[in-house]
């Protein structure tokens, strides 16, 4: 059959195709006619960006349909989306994509309607109309996907003056959203609010359901003294994370902030300051941790194991890993040992190339398994 492809310059190209052709095939035909490399092409139909591995019939593209061709700015990149079940999805995006576009891609891959998706990055809920670049989301960033439960509820917020405020919320609302609602009602800026429930200070990027806050629960609102400060946390990879904290924060709160930024569960974190391991129930001021102090983060291995990585030169590297480590994590460990950037690494096991977002256990890689490392030539696929 014939279909049409319209470019941004207004030119229309006619292509001979079959319903069973993949989008990849169509891009190759466009390359033959127009000389545009497939990796610079984005095809749009009915407002949706078409994925390479799908067919025309998957998108119900019929004879004489018109596709729109948009040139991919060189800002094409991959990002990861982590669900609460721990599954990681890889998406091809551009810095100029809106959050709405990203949710549509997640719907294509996972079938979750956009209105049930909430995307979180660096502890912030992302708004549909903003772009990835607005939030400084760069290649290989990880977003967190939280499902929006249907059906609202009421909760109460009690202030130190004894006043009680009633709020309409959803279990999937973040603490940040709740603070914004309090600001709407009471005029108190979110950065001066601290919310306490069951004796715990609530972190902005977490949801009410994360804290098991249910209908008619009561939160306590404490005004934040201007004593906020920044501290640094240095990881074994040499990365330094900056955290906004207060001297009265517990070590548990600090670990929760690290989880929000880096996705590392608190029970796998050990924090060291002045040579001492810090205990969850103590506060920063208990340890005399002051502004711009640096803590050291050591990961606690759970049921760790060793695996081997064999290079083409015949060298074998030993790595300490966990079954739950992603291939991305493994490549980072190889980078730490060998200095090879992750984007130049291809890992092979049992004849299969391993995908970044999957875990070792997904591939049934067990202790003392051997992976093979092949270097990706630059500019190669």
Swiss-Prot record:
There is a cross-link at residue 48 (Glycyl lysine isopeptide (Lys-Gly) (interchain with G-Cter in ubiquitin)). Keywords: Cytoplasm, Isopeptide bond, Nucleus, Repeat, Ubl conjugation. Residues 381 form a propeptide. There is a cross-link at residue 76 (Glycyl lysine isopeptide (Gly-Lys) (interchain with K-? in acceptor proteins)). GO terms for cellular component: cytoplasm; nucleus. PANTHER family: UBIQUITIN. Ubiquitin is generally synthesized as a polyubiquitin precursor. Some ubiquitin genes contain a single copy of ubiquitin fused to a ribosomal protein. This is Polyubiquitin. The lineage of its organism: Eukaryota, Sar, Alveolata, Ciliophora, Intramacronucleata.
